[in-house]
Amino acid sequence: MSLIVDIHRALGSFRLDVSFEAENGVTCLLGASGCGKSFTLKCIAGIEKPDSGHIELDGAVLYDSEKHINLPPQKRQVGYLFQNYALFPNMTVRQNILCGLHREKNRAEKERKLAEMLKLMQLEGLENHKPAQLSGGQQQRVALARIMVNEPRLLMLDEPFSALDAHLRDSLKIELRDMLQRFGHEVLMVTHSREEAYNMSSRIAVMDQGRLLTIKDTKDLFADPGSIPAAVLTGCKNIVPARKVGDREVEVPDWGIRLQTAQEVRDGLAAIGIRAHYFNTQTRQNRFPVSYVEEMEEPFELILQFRYAGQTADSPPIWWRLSKEKRPGEFPEALGISPANILLLYE
């Protein structure tokens, strides 16, 4: 099972150039608003048409500009969950799901598939409820049932938690993740939330200004984002220009320091990143004097902002985030950073 996408589309001054392959499991398109994530889904679904390129699902060509192939949405076997779920407000749960079976002529088969989907999505007993009578999570399950009753080969989710209150999201992430694991085919999900991407996906494709920069296994991306946009999207707070001065050494002019790295530094280095949790009071490597400029308290964590002794005046302070339980009685005069925790970011 595989999805192959290589598409190009000009939209005024914006240009979409996306090329990737996805296999069984959940692949997340992660990027800022307006980077082309949702438009990519619409091209795959057949709602929008690229200017050129190729889209293939499990060996079947959905779109090919050179061969003049452009299957209509209903023939692509692609399920698309919109941000607002697009349920019919005047229809019951039963009626909404049956809309997905409008091409099934056998009444007994319709009822069998409906009952199967109601059980799978834990909607039994809600058949005669209308969307307004359902919780946000129940509405999402109805929308998914309407899609999955058609047995799509690819399921696409566009910001699946954006319509939900914040306090519902964590429990519904677990529910949806379990459902997607039972789906058994490719899933493509769009989000701008790094937490959702990390929780839900096995792979992440990073998008920036219409381009797909990289696609990696989820944990690998957070461990080694490789570029400034990917580091920003994965939540790295400390990103600063740097240059290579040795095989495993970089200079950071804005901070007035040199750092030893665990990875070999390649040519084309643009910056380094250090996650706010990575600073350490005990580490002796890459240890330099610091002065503290700001302290901010969160419910469970403490954020300290500091500057290195040789740091330039116009460079922003550096973030250190630690558990409130680990707050030192006196802040240390110097902090270290393990060479393994230096993220090398390339052009």
Positions of PLM-derived features:
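Non-catalytic connector elements of ABC transporters
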Residues: 5-27, 32, 38-39, 46-49, ...
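ABC ATPase nucleotide-binding domain helices that frame the ATP-binding cleft
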Residues: 38-41, 142
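The short alpha-helix immediately C-terminal to the Walker A/P-loop
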Residues: 42-43, 203
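A position-specific signal in ABC ATPase nucleotide-binding domains
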Residues: 48-49, 56, 102
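ABC ATPase NBD Q-loop/coupling interface
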Residues: 54-76
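ABC ATPase nucleotide-binding domains
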Residues: 77-79, 83, 87-229
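C-terminal boundary and immediately downstream tail of ABC-type ATPase nucleotide-binding domains
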Residues: 223-246, 273
